[in-house]
Amino acid sequence: MFEINPVKNRIQDLSERSAVLRGYLDYDAKKERLEEVNAELEQPDVWNEPERAQALGKERSSLEAIVDTIDQLTQGLEDVAGLLELAVEEDDEDTFNDTTVELDALENKLGQLEFRRMFSGQYDSADCYLDIQAGSGGTEAQDWASMLVRMYLRWAEAKGFKTEIIEESDGDVAGTKSATIKIIGDYAFGWLRTETGVHRLVRKSPFDSGGRRHTSFSSAFVYPEVEDDIDIEINPADLRIDVYRASGAGGQHVNRTESAVRITHMPTGIVTQCQNDRSQHKNKDQAMKQLKAKLYEFEMQKKNAEKQAMEDNKSDIGWGSQIRSYVLDDSRIKDLRTGVETRNTQAVLDGDLDKFIEASLKAGL
C-alpha cells in the first residue's frame, strides 16, 4: 500500500499557491483582455495598421503566457486528483507513481509563473539591448568579449527569445571589441537587468606562447527598449479652465464677452491659452490642442531623461563593478554578489545562466 496523504497535501498546497497567483496576476481581467485582443486580431483590416497589429500580437503572447499556464495548472491539478483516486481504487502503484510525476511537472510550471512576480519593474516586460565592451588587455580581452556575446546568444536561444546583432566591432587579431545585441521576447529586460556589470576571466591564454595565466575584463550593460509612441490622455479632473475677456486686436466684440480661454494642467503646471477667436468653444478647442502638444513634448523630455540616465549609468560601470568571476583553470565560476558558484564552466559559457540570474533577482539586486 502506498502513502496517499503526502500526495494529497501536495495537491492542496499547489492548489492554494495557484489560487494566490491567480489573484495576484489578475487572471480574470487578463482572460477578458485576451478575448478582446483575439477579436481585434481576427478583424480583416487589422494589418492596415502594422505597428498596432504587431503590438496586439505581442500583447497576446504575454497574456497567453499567464492565462494558458493558469488554465493548465487548474486542469492539471483536477486531473492529478482524479488519477490519485483511480490509483487508490485499483491499488495500482504505477498509476500512483504517475501522479507524483505529474505533480512534479505542475510544480515546476507553477514555480516558473511565481517567478514572474519578480518582474515588477516599469520596463521589466520590455525587449532589451545588451552592450558588450572589451576591457583593456588587447586580444585576450577582446576574445573574452566574443565569448560573452556567444554565451548570451546561447542563453537567449534557450529561453526562446529572438536576437539581433545590432552592431559588432571585430577585435584587432581575434574576438570582439564591442557588440550590441537586441533581445526580443516577454520580460527580456526583466531577466537580464541584473547582468549589468564587469565580468572577469582568468585562464591560461591561448594567445600567449608561454601559456601563462591572464586576467581579462569585459563589461555588460543591459537597458530596455523604450517605446517612442506616447499616448496622451488628459483627465478632465486634472484641468482648471478659466475664461476671461480677450484683450488686444480682435474686432468689435473682443472685450464684450468672455471668449478667451486659459487651461491649466494641474499635475504638471503646464498652461495654455487662446483668445484669437470670438467663439469660446473654438478657443477652448485650440487651447486643448496646444495642451496635448505640450504634454507630448513633456513626456518626450521625460523619456529622453530616462534614456540619458541609462547612458549615465552605463558610464558609471567601472572595472571595479565586478559581478562574476570565471576562473577556467580552477573550473569555477562565482557570482560575487550572491555567492552562487558552479564548477561546470563549459555549461555556463554555453548559456546556462539561470542559476545566477534567478539568485540575483531573488536577492533584489
UniProtKB/Swiss-Prot annotation:
Keywords: Cytoplasm, Methylation, Protein biosynthesis. Gene3D superfamilies: 3.30.160.20, 3.30.70.1660, Release factor. The keyword Cytoplasm applies. GO terms for molecular function: translation release factor activity, codon specific. The modification N5-methylglutamine is found at residue 252. It comes from the Bacteria. Peptide chain release factor 2 directs the termination of translation in response to the peptide chain termination codons UGA and UAA. This is Peptide chain release factor 2. The gene is prfB.
